[in-house]
Amino acid sequence: MALLQIAEPGQSSAPHEHKLAAGIDLGTTNSLVASVRSGDATTLNDEQGRSILPSVVNYSAESTVVGYDAKAKAEFEPENTIISVKRLIGRSLKDIQSRYPSLPYRFKESDNGLPVLQTAQGDKNPIEVSADILKALGKRAEETLGGDLAGVVITVPAYFDDAQRAGTKDAAKLAGLHVLRLLNEPTAAAIAYGLDSGQEGVIAVYDLGGGTFDISILRLSKGVFEVLATGGDSALGGDDFDHLLADYLMEQAGLEAPLSAEKNRALLNIATATKIAFSEQDSVEVDVFGWKGTVTREQFEDLIRPLVKKTLMSCRRALKDADVEAEEVLEVVMVGGSTRTLLVREMVGEFFGRTPLTSINPDEVVAIGAGIQADILAGNKPDSEMLLLDVIPLSLGIETMGGLVEKIIPRNTTIPVARAQEFTTFKDGQTAMSVHVVQGEREMVDDCRSLARFSLKGIPPMAAGAAHIRVTYQVDADGLLSVTAMEKSTGVQSEIQVKPSYGLSDNEVANMLRDSMTHAKEDMQARALAEQRVEADRVIEGLIAAMQADGDELLSEQEKQDLLKAIEALIELRNGDDANAIEQGIKDTDKASQDFASRRMDKSIRAALSGQSVDDI
């Protein structure tokens, strides 16, 4: 008789076989790949000994080039050389053109409104461009490690939404990589530092890359990494420092906009080189198309100071969300190449009141953390007790009668998570229910973001309030949401995977949070009014239906007139804006209809007992 082999989920069926896995930091400006070798997580270098791969792809008619060689072509072939593609994932063409009007690419819109880049090699979408970067990193890992990869962990900004996360996974699939997990970049940094230093307590991870900024407040305790709160800006990074400096140099050189694509790229390269030099020098000599001059670090810092302050505002919000004071933060982990900027380190240190940690290369720390996590998920460390708890950035809810939002999963809930709540029908004989999934902190649907709608059909016709519909929200480890609605008596159910078409920027997330606090009082007043209106509608509809069914038999003409007057008075109040007045009107109507309700109850009891003997009862 054959034996059935049993293995732990996600782990090798051959427990002593070491599986090859890698962590990939898919960055806006640069990307890296890391793996655990001989017990240590290290980044994997190319043939020239470089760990960094520029996130740049050049498409010529003959070939696809990725990395440094592609970057070298950017100045001469800007339309065919795609840079910072991470900013484009999960966004509509309209959104991209409004956010980044100076991009040198030739865009066109696909049938579903998504962006397509026209290159010498043909049309490419952002997912295909990302896939080419991932393919190059996967190839480097397999050549260095000497075998096929069992899987990869890919890092994403903490504020990437469903569309951006799904796009990243699709890119990996296109690159032929098996994704073990998507991991938030700040969480990956915490893994790298947490395991190395054995810290326990509250840690802030300040991640300023080329195109995105993330702040995460984490609590590290006995191997458990819990993200208390996150914040950031998906459209702020070192690239913006470059653009500000480029604009300044353009002004100093007396150049007029717009520049040609080639000159624009050359100017950005000068700005980037100048910015990097300021990490070592107080002033830099520049040559901008024949104009020669000196730029000081102080001038550069004056340009970027407002942007650094903007990151600190996000830090302040994240601390408030985590219910943590800046003084409670034990360590500040610096992540991302842009944290090499001296002003950034100085202002972050002043804000938190301590010198930031920079002992691990800020360019490599995220990839190293991802490499450690990939090694664990591949099953190479079955005894690992490390637990990872990410959070959702905005509450997930459902629309109820009156345009109200009922929150199912509150913001900053750790994931993966599943929450269920029961709802019922509003009208007699209702056989279908529309489920509207929303995201946000406000009390009314109109003030939140719509994610998806679907219908549950086949509900047995019953009296209003008799049906029981269980709605379940489930967010997986990658932050993707699925919603299920099930009618309990029949088991009929409907389900939807929520993948919004376009991304929600961190500025929009921050604005939604700020609006929820600014409008908290008026939101609660609006909710109270909506709730009373819904209750008034229920009372009015119920009383009218009862009078149509039994009014002629159980009520005198005068009693009918009195009840109709009560209904009219309640309708008038219901159409007003005074929640307290509507509540009182409901009480008055209930009181006026009390005798009628008693007579209907008596009639129902008599009908139920008709034809039965005492012994039967």
Curated annotation (Swiss-Prot):
GO MF assignments: ATP binding; ATP hydrolysis activity; ATP-dependent protein folding chaperone; unfolded protein binding
Q: Name one GO biological process term.
A: iron-sulfur cluster assembly
Keywords, alphabetical: ATP-binding, Chaperone, Nucleotide-binding
Q: Where are the transmembrane segments?
A: none
Domain of life of the native organism: Bacteria
Which InterPro entries does this chain map to?
ATPase_NBD, Heat_shock_70_CS, HscA_NBD, HSP70_C_sf, HSP70_peptide-bd_sf, Hsp_70_fam, ISC_FeS_clus_asmbl_HscA
Which residues constitute the signal peptide according to the record? Answer: none
One Pfam family for this entry, by name?
HSP70
Q: Does the keyword Cell membrane apply?
A: no
Which PANTHER family does this entry report, sorted A to Z? Answer: HEAT SHOCK PROTEIN 70KDA
User: What does it do?
Assistant: Probable chaperone. Has a low intrinsic ATPase activity which is markedly stimulated by HscB.
| Family designation | Belongs to the heat shock protein 70 family.
Q: Which NCBIfam families match?
A: HscA, PRK05183.1
Fetch the HAMAP family from UniProt. HscA
Name of this protein: Chaperone protein HscA homolog
